[in-house]
Amino acid sequence: MSTGLFDFNGTLPVMGLQVVLLSWLLEQILYSPIQGVIQKRQNKIQQELQLAADQLQKAQQLTQEYQTQLQKAREKARERIRQVQQEAQTMMEDQLKQAQQQMTQLFNEAMQQLEQQKQQALMNLSNQVDEVAKFILSKLMKQ
């Protein structure tokens, strides 16, 4: 009988067997199910990460498409504004030309009327001068 740390009697193999049996039982009852749950959780996390990455890629693609469409819409709006401004400028120039033509026409008509009135006044004046001259001449002749 030895009182050392390790006694090689029947208890040592039984304890070894108990450790092996307990390890096997823990593996079957506790570790394997926990590893299964952990593996399922990791798989679920991986799937969710993949889904999130796919959705992020889709969102980025949609964002790019919307930005492209927005840029095209802005370009169309700028072009339309330019066209409207050009049309307004052309319309304004046309109206200005038309107004100038009307003013020129009115001026010419007024000048013609003034010329006619001048000619009429000169004729009346000439007639009156002739009448006065005839009157004076007739008075002078009577004397």
Swiss-Prot record:
Its main location: plastid. It comes from Cyanidioschyzon merolae (strain NIES-3377 / 10D) (Unicellular red alga). PANTHER family: ATP SYNTHASE SUBUNIT B', CHLOROPLASTIC (PTHR33445:SF2). F(1)F(0) ATP synthase produces ATP from ADP in the presence of a proton or sodium gradient. F-type ATPases consist of two structural domains, F(1) containing the extramembraneous catalytic core and F(0) containing the membrane proton channel, linked together by a central stalk and a peripheral stalk. During catalysis, ATP synthesis in the catalytic domain of F(1) is coupled via a rotary mechanism of the central stalk subunits to proton translocation. Component of the F(0) channel, it forms part of the peripheral stalk, linking F(1) to F(0). The b'-subunit is a diverged and duplicated form of b found in plants and photosynthetic bacteria. The chain crosses the membrane at residues 12-31. F-type ATPases have 2 components, F(1) - the catalytic core - and F(0) - the membrane proton channel. F(1) has five subunits: alpha(3), beta(3), gamma(1), delta(1), epsilon(1). F(0) has four main subunits: a(1), b(1), b'(1) and c(10-14). The alpha and beta chains form an alternating ring which encloses part of the gamma chain. F(1) is attached to F(0) by a central stalk formed by the gamma and epsilon chains, while a peripheral stalk is formed by the delta, b and b' chains. It is found in: Plastid, Chloroplast thylakoid membrane. It is a single-pass membrane protein. This is ATP synthase subunit b', chloroplastic. The gene is atpF2. It comes from the Eukaryota. The keyword DNA-binding does not apply. GO terms for cellular component: chloroplast thylakoid membrane; proton-transporting ATP synthase complex. InterPro entries: ATP_synth_b, ATP_synth_b/b'su_bac/chlpt, ATP_synthase_B_chain. One of its GO terms (molecular function) is proton-transporting ATP synthase activity, rotational mechanism. It holds the Pfam family ATP-synt_B. In plastids the F-type ATPase is also known as CF(1)CF(0). Belongs to the ATPase B chain family.
